[in-house]
């Protein structure tokens, strides 16, 4: 019979950890994140640490996106506890920009190499949210698996908060009772949900991007990795109306758009060579309707990020189409997502580099970077060079396809000068001519002698539809 976890009050967690790790200089704590963030545990532990006169052991909190309150990044806590964030927003992003939290650069597919046995951030403690099946007694990590298996396998103390209203998902989200040491059942906060996208009213620029991707790259039987956000929603909306069949899903984040396609039967996963018959994801994030959909549904199964983002797995589900967005792209094909500029951290790299490198041969599929040509303030997202000091998710040697509302720049196999011409050609018209002149006049950018201004360069397909911006 499996050992059952000990039920404790959330206020007791800090004392349990102080007693267990008495004499240690620091404690590495991995926190389950995203929609299933264990906010009750985070708040209770933070309050206890703040009230304690002890400064040792020091708590290092490793995590992904934490949507709720994150008291341990507040001012005055950093001599006792600090965030090491792989992906950030809200309070953690602000704290990182003010020096009260660390950004820990890591792709989602490589988290296990950072927190695994003997690694710098091997967890001593894991905090997570779980739900439980009233039929089998099994626990499920529900909406977020990410790297929790690796964390649990190598940690000494596992603390869970039980949220019986969280969806019970299948696959590798399911764990037995003996995997949990302590469980909190009172004062638990609900999972985080977000408004469902309006797929019928997608803005013109995003819709154009969706049309370009759907018409040029999506095929019957393709496997998709599509994130969440306005541009991925536009791709979903276009696929919905385009008549595709037998699509599959292998993705980090499963959102409302993929649910809509699966409900319509457009996604059925029949053609996937691996994990045939069900969508695979590592995180679910979106609306209440989405959470109701994935609850107990065998057609959507959870896997760790090291699996969903694995090049070996991706290459077994060809043709594979990966769609991600970015902060910007430069003339050389460099892409950045984590920073707006060297002084302003924004989020993290997610799994974008994992999929770009997994699809480094056209035989495997297409890694697409989809961006609007300008920011909301009218600044070009295509620039001559990336901001100095920012980390890159794709470099000039990565074979990517860039899509804006003005066209497609397929950079695969192009020389440096042709890459620059291709990227500049899909810039916003307010910038395009100046960019092209800059490239043509630059002797360092080797171009064909036959190139004439106004020609469409190799690799470029301009938007020719009717959607207005």
Region annotations inferred by a language model:
Residues 1-469:
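Conserved alpha/beta enzyme-core scaffold
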């Amino acid at each position: 019979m499996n050992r059952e976890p000990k039920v404790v009050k959330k206020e007791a967690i800090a004392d349990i950890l102080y007693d267990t790790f008495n004499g240690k200089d620091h404690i590495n704590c991995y926190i389950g994140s995203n929609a299933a963030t264990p906010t009750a545990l985070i708040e209770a532990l933070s309050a206890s640490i703040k009230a304690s006169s002890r400064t040792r052991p020091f708590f290092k909190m490793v995590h992904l996106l934490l949507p709720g309150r994150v008291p341990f990044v507040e001012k005055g806590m950093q001599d006792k506890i600090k965030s090491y964030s792989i992906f950030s927003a809200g309070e953690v992003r602000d704290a990182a920009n003010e020096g009260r939290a660390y950004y820990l650069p890591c792709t989602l597919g490589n988290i296990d190499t950072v927190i695994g046995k003997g690694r710098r951030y091997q967890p001593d403690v894991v905090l997570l949210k779980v739900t439980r099946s009233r039929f089998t007694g099994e626990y499920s990590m529900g909406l977020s698996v990410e790297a929790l298996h690796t964390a649990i396998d190598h940690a000494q103390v596992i603390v869970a908060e039980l949220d019986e209203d969280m969806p019970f998902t299948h696959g590798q989200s399911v764990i037995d009772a003996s995997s949990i040491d302590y469980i909190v059942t009172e004062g638990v906060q609900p999972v985080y949900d977000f408004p469902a996208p309006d797929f019928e009213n997608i803005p013109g620029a995003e819709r154009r991007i969706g049309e370009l991707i759907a018409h040029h790259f999506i095929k019957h039987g393709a496997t998709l990795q599509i994130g969440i956000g306005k541009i991925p929603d536009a791709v979903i909306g276009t696929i919905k109306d385009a008549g595709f069949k037998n699509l599959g899903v292998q993705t980090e984040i499963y959102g409302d758009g993929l649910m809509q396609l699966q409900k319509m039967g457009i996604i059925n996963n029949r053609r996937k060579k691996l994990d045939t018959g069900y969508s695979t994801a590592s995180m679910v994030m979106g609306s209440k309707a989405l959470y109701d959909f994935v609850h107990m549904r065998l057609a959507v199964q959870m896997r760790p990020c090291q699996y969903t983002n694995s090049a070996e797995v991706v290459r077994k589900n060809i043709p594979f189409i990966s769609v991600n967005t970015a902060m910007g792209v430069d003339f050389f094909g460099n892409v950045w997502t984590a920073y707006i500029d060297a002084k302003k951290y924004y989020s993290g790299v997610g799994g974008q580099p994992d999929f770009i490198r997994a699809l480094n041969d056209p035989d495997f599929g297409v890694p697409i970077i989809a961006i609007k040509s300008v920011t909301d303030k009218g600044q070009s997202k295509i620039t001559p060079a990336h901001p100095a000091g920012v980390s890159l998710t794709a470099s000039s040697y990565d074979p990517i396809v860039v899509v804006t509302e003005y066209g497609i720049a397929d950079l695969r196999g192009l020389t440096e000068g042709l890459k620059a011409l291709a990227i500049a050609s899909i810039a916003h018209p307010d910038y395009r001519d100046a960019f092209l002149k800059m490239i043509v006049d630059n002797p360092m950018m080797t171009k064909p002698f036959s190139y004439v201004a106004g020609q469409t360069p190799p690799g470029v397909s301009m938007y020719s539809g009717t959607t207005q911006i």
